[in-house]
Amino acid sequence: MVLGLLAFIWLMRAWRQSLKIWVDVPSIGKDGILGQWITALQWQQKARSLIQEGYEKHGHYAFKIATPSRWEIFICNEKMIKEYKNLMDDKFSANAVTADMFQTKWTAPGAAEGVHKIPIPLLAKALTWQRNRSSVTGDTYFKEFVTEFLHAWEVETKITSEGPYEFCCFETGTRIVAHLTAKSLVGHPLCRDPEIIDLFAGYGNAVPSSGFLIAMFPGILKPLVAKFCEAPKMSDRLDRIFLSEMKERQLQTGSDASDIMSWLWHWTQENEPGKYSEVDIVRSITSAVFGAIHTTTQVLVHCLFELATRPEYVEPLRQEVQQAVENHGGWEKEGIESMLKLDSFIKECQRFNPLDSGSLARCATNDFTFSNGLKVAKGTYVFAPNAPVLFDERFYPNPHQFDGYRFYRLGQQTGKPQGFRFVATNSNYLQFGDGRHTCPGRYMAADEIRLMLGHILLHYDITTKENEGRPKNWFFKKILFPDMKGVIVLKKRAEVRAVNK
């Protein structure tokens, strides 16, 4: 009780201090000091509607909203967004926002602010190396990836009967994504280790819950609170397992890089020897687990919910998947890339259920002045609107109507299908960010989601539970979550044409 009182007093003091960081843009919510308090208290439940209101009123410029911890500034003007999104961390830091939101100093030290760590561009280089392997003749990586998915499906679903099977989308989806993430990051034998899968699946959910709790307390109490949270314990355990595996691999002379962890070790030894330690590498891998699993699973769950409640898409998408598999002799990378309608359906599911109402989150690490004269003080949190843009009639006709072929048609009409793929970003589609900090793992996420949806479409009929509609989304601050206990019903199809399972 004493700790709670101290935390409350500290939060109120921190809130008052943070509101002193003033930016001269219109405010959304109630006026005056009391009004700011009321708006801040509404943030947890009404953040998305407040951001929508700001966008509708000031979508040509910018606005600010009082939250329990600070003013949050939303930049709507495209020219201003371009000004800040590509700036280096000495002016606007993306990592500082993540570090504060999830308290990564304790929950994910490999992503903490102000520590020596593997830089994101190097991790992106590793992911690019892995992605390129899929198109190299004779490279077995993608076949191994498919094999790992089929193994994960069998282990995690255990569907043996022909009758209806209730499939818990979030729980089972998280664990299957954990298998594939482990395959990518640390490879065999760890990706088949039950403890690793448990840790990967649990860590993806523990980071935000632990981070939100730790953030409620003043700095002097954070280390104590962290000792009672799950994420720091899981992070430490993963670090120790990865470090042991890395040391064992170093004893095996002549082994080539086969996963992200081993690639980082080889690359740093060859190009920057002595700059990064083994601990730096394993901590970067552990930190990557959260980002790789958390958002991928949420998009996957939305896709499953939408597919189960929109039966008109099932047969056309099934035919496209079947044709691609037959044309390429099984699950091949080229075949998955040819599934343009399925890719469009996934992107529309993501557009229709946007994870975050804001994007391009940055913290000003120094005072900054935009070219139009707007001054932003050091410590200011800046965002670009995301959800409001995705439902803006100017960019997406009939935005409140789900259209699974929306992006497929746009690709055909413009003659530029690549610009409308699930992984594509632009100023009106910021789900993966844009600029310097565009999500480097989005290609792997696309493969995971397409594999799982394609497998389900080929092998199962998919519906909702009887007399139940789509499991409802829920909201916390700016974030939209799918129903984590929601289920769909799968039933094995009577006739399934041959495919490598």
From Swiss-Prot:
Domain of life: Eukaryota
Glycosylation sites: 132
Keyword Transcription regulation among record annotations: no
One term under GO cellular component: membrane
Required cofactor names: heme
An example Gene Ontology molecular-function term: oxidoreductase activity, acting on paired donors, with incorporation or reduction of molecular oxygen
Keyword field: Glycoprotein, Heme, Iron, Membrane, Metal-binding, Monooxygenase, Oxidoreductase, Transmembrane, Transmembrane helix
Enzyme class: oxidoreductase
Residues binding heme, per UniProt: 439
Compartments where located: Membrane
EC number(s) reported in the record: 1.-.-.-
InterPro entries recorded: Cyt_P450, Cyt_P450_CS, Cyt_P450_E_grp-I, Cyt_P450_sf
Membrane-topology descriptor: Single-pass membrane protein
Pathway: Secondary metabolite biosynthesis
PROSITE patterns, A to Z: CYTOCHROME_P450
TM region positions: 1-16
Any single GO BP term: mycotoxin biosynthetic process
Record's keyword annotation contains Metal-binding: yes
Gene3D superfamilies assigned to the protein according to its UniProt record, in alphabetical order: Cytochrome P450
Protein family: Belongs to the cytochrome P450 family.
Function of the protein: Cytochrome P450 monooxygenase; part of the gene cluster that mediates the biosynthesis of the indole diterpenes janthitremanes such as shearinine K or shearinine A. The geranylgeranyl diphosphate (GGPP) synthase janG catalyzes the first step in janthitremane biosynthesis via conversion of farnesyl pyrophosphate and isopentyl pyrophosphate into geranylgeranyl pyrophosphate (GGPP). Condensation of indole-3-glycerol phosphate with GGPP by the prenyl transferase janC then forms 3-geranylgeranylindole (3-GGI).
Protein name stated in the entry: Cytochrome P450 monooxygenase janQ
Organism annotation: Penicillium janthinellum (Penicillium vitale)
